[in-house]
């Protein structure tokens, strides 16, 4: 009997729930909240069939105990809005399982370690003007409603942009679905963004992050990218309408369209490679700056490929 088979036989939904809900110290602070645990049990009783099926499927993934240790909120994820508005509990369960089934299908290599790591992994490190440092990381999604993975761009160790996504099936194809695009924390002023843009020759942090993202998912053999808009972001769900009204102000559509993204139904279909301006179309006095911009983008591509292959 293999270790994987043994792990699957020993691990079951009851044991999984006991370990995340009853064992202290709790594997995630939310499980330590009595209100959260009560809500979890109540929601399980409201949707028993889908919940039991989901728990069984989780326990039949490869090395399920290790996965739950690294992602302790997985049992509760189907109970709350996920990825975008209107996604029912069955579709939420399917999306989560599709992501981990896809990720676990990889051979044992750098990519798989990055995708399943419980910590952030460096994907790119580069320098801008004046010794400014830009680092891009991949790690578990810190915004648990927006997917399973997050890429984070840091400027001189300050996070300025985060892109959250999952690998799911859509219209019969494997895609990367971007469900969140966050800027810096509230305490980070706009001057930091201006400094980062200036030190990267006019490249916005989100633009650099998207270059890293497209390179990374290509390394994962995924060519199709879709994204939510600000109108169907998960926080537009009715239950968050007033709670998040003042905090959610992002205009996703504007950024997607700047990348030549195309609206397809409720989602945007995004390019897997952003087209660059031809040299002859750039005014001569700006060509030197554009060369430096493209050098930074090329460096990001090289760094991501180097760290993930």
Language-model features and meaning:
Residues 122-125, 235, 239-240, 274-279:
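Charge-rich, low-complexity amphipathic helices
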Residues 161, 170-263:
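Acyl-donor binding region in acyl/amide transferases
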Residues 122-130, 134-138, 214, 223, ...:
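Generic preference for hydrophobic/aromatic residues in regular secondary structure cores
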Residues 2-195, 288-309:
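Non-catalytic substrate-recognition and accessory regions of acyl/acetyltransferase enzymes
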Residues 254-309:
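Charge-rich, low-complexity intrinsically disordered segments
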Residues 74, 87-88, 207-208, 217-223, ...:
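Noncatalytic linker/hinge segments flanking ATPase motor cores
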């Amino acid at each position: 009997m293999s270790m994987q088979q043994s792990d699957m036989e020993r691990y079951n939904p009851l044991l999984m729930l006991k370990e995340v809900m009853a064992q202290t110290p709790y594997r995630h602070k939310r499980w330590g909240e009595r209100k959260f645990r009560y809500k979890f049990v109540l929601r399980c009783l409201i949707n028993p069939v889908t919940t039991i099926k989901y728990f069984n499927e989780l326990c039949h993934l490869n090395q399920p105990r290790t996965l739950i240790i690294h992602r302790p909120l997985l049992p509760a994820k189907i109970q709350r809005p996920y990825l975008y508005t209107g996604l029912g509990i069955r579709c939420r369960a399917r999306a989560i399982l599709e992501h981990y089934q896809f990720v676990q299908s990889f051979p044992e290599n750098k990519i798989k370690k990055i995708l399943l790591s419980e910590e952030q992994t460096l994907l790119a490190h580069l320098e801008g003007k004046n010794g400014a440092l830009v680092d891009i990381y991949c790690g578990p999604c810190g915004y648990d409603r927006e997917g399973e993975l997050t890429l984070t761009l840091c400027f001189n160790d300050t996070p300025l942009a985060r892109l959250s996504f999952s690998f799911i099936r859509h219209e019969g194809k494997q895609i990367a679905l971007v469900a969140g695009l966050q800027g810096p924390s509230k305490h980070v002023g706009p001057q930091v963004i201006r400094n980062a843009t200036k030190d990267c020759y006019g490249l916005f942090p989100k633009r650099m992050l998207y270059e890293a993202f497209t390179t990374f998912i290509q390394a994962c053999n995924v060519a199709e990218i879709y994204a939510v808009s600000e109108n169907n972001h998960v926080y537009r769900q009715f239950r968050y309408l007033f709670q998040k009204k003042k905090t959610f102000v992002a205009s996703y559509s504007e950024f997607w369209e700047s990348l030549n993204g195309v609206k397809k139904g409720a989602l945007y279909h995004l390019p897997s490679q952003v087209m660059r301006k031809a040299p002859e179309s750039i005014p001569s006095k700006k060509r030197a700056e554009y060369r430096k911009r493209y050098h930074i983008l090329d460096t990001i591509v090289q760094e991501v490929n180097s760290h993930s292959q």
